[in-house]
Amino acid sequence: TMKKLLAIFIAAVIILGAVEVVRKPSAQQIVDDFDSIVHVISLTQITRDSKLIGKRENVGKDTYIGSYSSSCISENGRDVVFGGASVKDRKIKLKVKILTESGAASLRVRTGSDVKEYSVDENGIIEKTFDFNGGGNYAMIIYNNFTGTVEMTSEYAK
């Protein structure tokens, strides 16, 4: 599938280049158009609504912000909930509350090629701001034989 994504990306860049020559856009319009193409391709990395363990509500079409919740019994797997790829930088604040009856659930955040996993504090809370710089950036919930509830919100940090 990586070869297919690369072929689609290259075709999109060629088509965009041809359109841009005819349109004579500003530099910002070129960046915005390229960012849109990169973002659309990156959506394949986000778990589809129908495949989610939990339930996600995005704010409009923005895949970086919204809310997510799940109530689980012995669940295993991973939900890639928020994020995408972009040439633009974003500062995202994630708030996660995990109430565990058994098993484990954690927040995993990918920023570019760096992947880190975060556990809750003694109150079951994770609250952290991330710099989502250009590239692929995703917030995920990882379930390991988890019984309990998860709530997460993602918003732009000030």
For the regions a protein language model found, what residue spans apply to each?
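Hydrophobic membrane-insertion alpha-helices, especially the h-region
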Residues: 6-20
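Transition segment at domain starts
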Residues: 25-84
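Extracellular and analogous surface-interaction loops
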Residues: 74, 81-92, 129-134
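Short, solvent-exposed loop/turn segments in extracellular or other extracytoplasmic domains
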Residues: 77, 120-127
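A short beta-strand element within beta-rich, extracytoplasmic domains
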Residues: 90-100
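Short, surface-exposed beta-strand/strand-loop-strand elements in extracellular ectodomains
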Residues: 101-118
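Edge beta-strands of jelly-roll/beta-sandwich modules across compartments, strongly enriched
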Residues: 143-158
